[in-house]
Amino acid sequence: MMSAASTAPVASTSALPGSRFVPIERFGAVMGLATLAHAWLLAHAQYHAPWLIGALLAALALLLFVALGLRTLWQWWRMPLRVRAEWAHPQSKPLVGTLWISLLLLPLLLAPANMLAARVLWGIGALGALAWAWHTLGSWLRGRHRLASINAAWLIPVVGVLDIPLALPALRWVPALTPLAAFALLFGALFTPLVSTLIFARMALGRALPPAQLAALLILAAPPAVASSVLRLVFPALPMLALGVLLLAVFLLVLLLPQFARDSRAHDFEAAWWTLSFPLAATTVAAQLNTPWGGFAGLCLALLLLALTSAVVAVLLLGSLRLFWRGSRAR
């Protein structure tokens, strides 16, 4: 999701000889895998889909999170200047939200096995998401940003706050924390249109996006998808509103997926394209939760999205393995 311009300040800092810097945005893969795992576990409960698929995806998401978490801590220890530069740059700063979102999504998978661990992870993720949204939005209000520095990743801090209520039912914190869920929805309702307007202005008036940022546009579909799930899980008395917000997410996917498919043909696979996975998986989960009100069409939509998201994640996994293999051979 970071362009060459965005990585310039980071690349200019010193690094250890032979070391390879792993950007914070790689936690986006954890987001996609964890949400798709949740979708398959829901499919097991609703349609008797194979439980093993969801379990394997959940294990992969947890292992990847641990690996990336350890790598991030190592980089803070050995390359602090480089990490600080990444966390401070206007284009990469919002991507830090992928870490907090991962911490908010993993409790959905952990809660049935270890409620205490799930609640601890959720608490860290919720505090981190709120603090980082406050910090990031404050930095935008101070100005001095260029149109070229705006990209769809600017929505990630907003999505982070919206994700806070998702695990509340699994953690058995409804209705105790229902006001927090209402705050998250209102936060998203306020800031999603504002940031989306900036992103559309960047697309209409700015230069073409670099290859690494092409998939980031699909983040525009994430806020309505997450909001629809929150409405169904925490505010079930508003089924039509949840269904309408889901349809908005589907519309945005239909609008943006063909554009990504067209623009990405001329480029090699980018690890940053994992950005595709979370909006697709989040919309899939929202469609599954709204199936009782969508009728047969809603069921078909949920199954279609589950198949599409699974296929996309499979392609992303294969592409990532190829990149890893090439990198290993190059060394």
For every predicted segment, state its role:
Residues L168-P169, W173-L194, F200, A215, ...:
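Surface-exposed interaction/gating patches
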Residues L109-P112, W132-H145, D163-A176, F191-A208, ...:
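Internal transmembrane alpha-helix with an interfacial aromatic "cap," most often the third helix
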Residues Y47-M115:
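Membrane helical hairpin/interfacial module
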